[in-house]
Amino acid sequence: TGIGIWKSINQSYNPKTDLEAIRLALTPGITGTTRQEGGTDRNAGAGLFFIKSIASVNSDFFVIYSGKAMYKLLKRKGKKIKLHVDPFEDRHSKKGDLPSWEGTVVGIDLSLDTTQEFSLLLKLLNETLNEAIKERKKARYKKPQFT
């Protein structure tokens, strides 16, 4: 087993629950290695977001379980493809009171056929990641900072 998402994310953020840590881990540009928006050259904080987004667009299976929490992506309704920065805006189910698991389990069933939808997905992933980082930077600099 590993250290789990909460312990990893807690190195740079302060999630109160395992479910909050999973939410952060699925958010583009957030990584446990730094609070720097967009991560670093070695860790951009986009991997789980990309995998979840591919599963969402293709209506594939995606579930993540860490600590006492689980997040499961549900098949999207309708044909319109939209990526959400906040994973809780996707159709999903979640639980925060499960038996504790010290590491992290990710279950995925992905179809990676190169289709028009997949090409669109790559474009949307890039746009969504860049927009999420830009919005968080803007929000951060609006806060008063006192020393």
Protein language model annotation of sequence segments:
Residues 8-9:
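Structured extramembrane domains adjacent to transmembrane segments
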